[in-house]
Design a protein with these regions (language model features):
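Local sequence-structure signature of Cys/Sec-based thiol-disulfide redox active-site neighborhoods
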Residues: 1-28
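Nucleotide phosphate-binding site architecture
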Residues: 13, 53, 67
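Short alpha-helical
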Residues: 13-14, 41-42, 76
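Structural micro-motif
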Residues: 48-59
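Non-catalytic, surface beta->alpha helical segment in thiol-disulfide oxidoreductase systems
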Residues: 59-91
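Thiol-based oxidoreductase modules, predominantly thioredoxin-like and allied folds used
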Residues: 5-8, 28-43
Length: 91
């Protein structure tokens, strides 16, 4: 099974855009986990393990191994999220 995390941080405008587009898609909660990339102003251990260097970053893991990453919000439209949810929603 693939776990999909959208890494975001507080005050990040591109993150807000990506989250807003994601939340327009029915069933997103069953597919994507919104994950805070920072704790107390520092990258979280999980974010570091996933290679996150900027937000928003999307990371897909299968059996704990990174299988895909995507950084930046420019392509994280509602159509992108809809396709992601449709592809991974019935696994």
């Amino acid at each position: 099974m693939t776990d999909i995390h959208l890494f975001v941080q507080e005050g990040c405008r591109p993150c807000m855009y990506a989250e807003t587009q994601l939340k327009k898609v029915e069933g997103w909660e069953n597919v994507v986990t919104i994950t805070n990339a920072k704790e107390n102003g520092e990258w979280s251990e999980f974010a570091k393990q996933c290679g996150v260097q900027a937000t928003p970053t999307l990371v897909a893991l299968t059996d704990g191994n990174i299988v895909a990453t995507k950084a930046g919000s420019q392509d994280m439209t509602s159509d992108f999220w809809r396709a992601t949810v449709e592809k991974h929603g019935n696994v």
